Amino acid sequence: MIFSNNKKLKFKRVIIKLSGEALQGVHKFGIDIIELNRIAKEIKAIFDLGVQIGIVIGGGNIFRGKKLAKFGINKVISDYVGMLSTIMNGLLLCDSMDLVHLSSCLMSSICIDKICEQYSFKKALSLLRRNKVVVFSGGLGNPFFTTDSAACLRAIEMRADIVLKGTKVNGVYSSDPKKSSNSILYKNISYNEVLQKELKVMDLAAFALARDHKLPICIFNINKPNALYYIVTGQKEGTLIR
């Protein structure tokens, strides 16, 4: 699809929450390079419109801390292993973006100076202003916090207009669409309605952070072609929470 670069932007600075599972493609584990490259092109399309982009990346395609904890491994240790998985994903995403001539910087909450930069609020903000894509890895650098919390905190710190959470479904539903044919897809919903209806959007700590700072969240299907383009240009896509 050929995009128009003259489209008026609804959101000029965004934080994309990209789950590890989004990078799996058709696989049950690891990374689907074809899917990774497709996502990089989707990111490039909105970058070319003039959108400033930060990406918080997950690591569930490689490792989930919760799984080891179930087998008796210390939760702190298993969470740190999960954080390392996000750095691996971040490295590959940056390389994929480089292939489409998209300049990026991988930052991490965990210090691994050979392969990524230590997260710095001022440096990250400066990079965004200079039109570099910033990939935030390592979660928050502390156990017991999810990458959803990292996405919301980084969005607040970077003064982003919105968090775009890419999932495998088209948005927020009234019930599980796989279990109920009567499930309704919400196009717009408030923070309070999400809490009252006990809808699964993200973990409560992350969601409360977004609500308290009046940070809009859009839940959308990352596997749907052109979804990012539609969102930043103000077209109806996914579920907008505000």
Curated annotation (Swiss-Prot):
GO terms for molecular function: ATP binding; UMP kinase activity. It is found in: Cytoplasm. InterPro entries: AceGlu_kinase-like_sf (IPR036393), Asp/Glu/Uridylate_kinase (IPR001048), Uridylate_kinase (IPR011817), Uridylate_kinase_bac (IPR015963). GO terms for cellular component: cytosol. It is an enzyme of class 2 (transferase). GO terms for biological process: 'de novo' CTP biosynthetic process; UDP biosynthetic process. The keyword Nucleotide-binding applies. Inhibited by UTP. It comes from the Bacteria. Keywords: ATP-binding, Cytoplasm, Kinase, Nucleotide-binding, Pyrimidine biosynthesis, Transferase. ATP binds at K17, L18, S19, G20, G60, R64, T167, Y173, D176. Belongs to the UMP kinase family. Catalyzes the reversible phosphorylation of UMP to UDP. This is Uridylate kinase. It comes from Buchnera aphidicola subsp. Baizongia pistaciae (strain Bp).
